[in-house]
A protein has these predicted regions:
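N-terminal export signals
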Residues: 2-23
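Ligand-binding loop in jelly-roll beta-barrel domains
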Residues: 101-127
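A short beta-loop-beta micro-motif enriched in histidine and acidic residues
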Residues: 57-69
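Short acidic-glycine-tyrosine-enriched beta hairpin
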Residues: 84-100
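A short glycine-rich, His/Asp/Glu-containing loop-to-beta-strand
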Residues: 26-60, 124
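Glycine- and acidic-residue-biased ligand/ion/polar-headgroup-sensing regions
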Residues: 66-83, 93
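Histidine-centered metal-chelating micro-motifs
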Residues: 58-60, 78, 95, 99-108
Length: 133
């Protein structure tokens, strides 16, 4: 039950972010759906982080100990997670990282415009949220 509540909270945070960016009349639509790994969320917490990239800026390869759901707030983010091919995500798109998965590429796809994403990190309390690869 706690797992549902925590994931529901994460979904609500992301839904709120989407509404604040572009209020559209006429209901709801699914913007992201992904199967989740089996985890016990007892003793876990949710942390929401805004990540801003200057034009051309990149993050070093890294991993997260829990589940990360990322939502692009502004610009375009180039990303490679796990075995998936490298992909560009634009404003309003989302991606997911499962526990321990390598996030090999995370960078602003533009050399001239800034980019920003909102990351919801679900992890055990007290764990470092990001570790170098």
């Amino acid at each position: 039950m706690k797992r549902r509540a925590l994931l529901g909270s994460a979904a609500a945070l992301l839904a709120q972010a989407r509404v604040s960016l572009a209020q559209t009349p006429g209901g709801r639509k699914v913007v992201f759906e992904h199967d989740l790994p089996e985890v016990n969320l007892k003793g876990w917490s949710a942390t929401v982080v805004e990540v801003s990239y200057a034009p051309g800026e990149a993050s070093a390869a890294h991993r997260h100990p829990g589940i990360t759901i990322a939502y692009v707030l502004e610009g375009e983010i180039r990303s490679k997670v796990g075995d998936e091919p490298e992909k560009t995500y634009t404003t309003g798109q989302m991606f997911l990282e499962t526990p321990g998965q390598l996030h090999a590429v995370s960078r602003n796809a533009s050399a001239t415009k800034p980019a920003k994403l909102l990351a919801v990190l679900l992890a055990e309390k007290g764990k470092q949220l990001t570790t170098p690869a």
